[in-house]
């Protein structure tokens, strides 16, 4: 079992490193073709930081492991909200720029309501569900880019009429490292999936539980890094805004893409009080934790230490119920 643990960790490292390389290279390419910093941040960076979750969920769904695909997406949202955001709030409560929260929060609750209703009513995530989620993703991205364009100043746009040989070399380098980043993410995702499954068998734990906890935590490490960096620099509002955006993309992009490519049934490999824990634990915790995070931020323009403490308690209970009940 030790070898599977080590390979699981190697997979996480490859995922995270590959994601970093992909984002850096994508930003370099986008700048070369004259995109503004705002649009790069709203599209390239936000998508790039979600690639680890996307590769794991899509890869799992295509290989017939819908439990891991579901658990990774839902578990990442819970981890982002009730652990990473909660720690940020608990350590340094702060005032919040509501503009960073409002649009992604609205889109999140609309898309998650559709996601949850599909699960409760049909017990499956169909291709139709995936297409609707991807449509919401496209609408959100269009809205974000359109909004960003309104804020572009001329000094943020790279002039394209003076391309030098060194810039062409840099472009080639960015394209090469972009490919390397994708390869690392793909390798890491495969290692994570394969060894996550083997660990679940070895420990006698359902695959959904492994995905909701260990895999979800691993693929959320980029958000944790961003949160810590933002806290150190005193940008708590930006950190929470990034987390809300990441949660939205986990629903509309990660889940939407994986379900569209390979529909799967709602996991039913773990029961709680004789009922499917996906319906009475996972998805309710996902919605409740986001409500606890967003309502005070949207209504008061501030987050409080007690919020962080309560969310951390929720995450602790959630993990306890996954492993010990």
PLM regions: where:
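Hydrophobic alpha-helical segments, chiefly the membrane-spanning helices
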Residues: 1-325
């Amino acid at each position: 079992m030790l070898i599977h643990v080590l390979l699981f960790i190697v997979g996480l490292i490859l995922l995270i490193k590959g994601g970093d390389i992909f984002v850096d290279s994508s930003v370099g390419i986008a700048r070369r073709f004259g995109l503004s910093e705002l649009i790069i941040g709203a599209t390239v960076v936000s998508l790039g930081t979600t690639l680890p979750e996307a590769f794991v969920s899509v890869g799992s769904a295509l290989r017939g492991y819908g439990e891991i695909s579901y658990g990774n997406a839902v578990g990442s949202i819970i981890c982002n909200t009730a652990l990473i955001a909660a720690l940020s709030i608990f350590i340094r409560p702060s005032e919040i720029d509501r503009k960073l929260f409002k649009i992604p929060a609205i889109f999140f609750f609309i898309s998650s309501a559709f996601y949850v209703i599909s699960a409760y009513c049909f017990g499956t995530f169909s291709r139709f569900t995936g297409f609707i989620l991807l449509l919401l993703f496209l609408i959100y991205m269009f809205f974000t880019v359109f909004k960003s364009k309104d804020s572009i100043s001329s000094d943020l746009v790279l002039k394209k009429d003076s391309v030098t040989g060194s810039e062409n070399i840099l472009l080639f380098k960015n394209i090469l490292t972009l490919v390397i980043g994708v390869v690392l993410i793909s390798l890491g995702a495969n290692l994570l999936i394969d060894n996550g499954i083997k660990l679940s068998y070895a420990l006698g734990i359902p695959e959904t539980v492994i995905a909701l906890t260990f895999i979800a935590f691993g693929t959320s490490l980029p958000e944790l890094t961003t949160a810590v960096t933002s806290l150190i620099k005193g940008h708590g509002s930006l950190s929470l805004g990034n987390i809300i955006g990441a949660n939205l993309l986990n629903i509309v992009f990660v889940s939407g893409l994986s379900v569209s490519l390979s529909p799967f049934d709602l996991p039913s490999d773990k029961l709680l009080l004789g009922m499917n824990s996906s319906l009475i634990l996972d998805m309710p915790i996902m919605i409740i934790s986001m409500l606890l995070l967003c309502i005070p931020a949207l209504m008061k323009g501030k987050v409080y230490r007690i919020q962080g403490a309560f969310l951390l308690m929720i995450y602790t209970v959630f993990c306890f119920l996954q492993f010990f009940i």
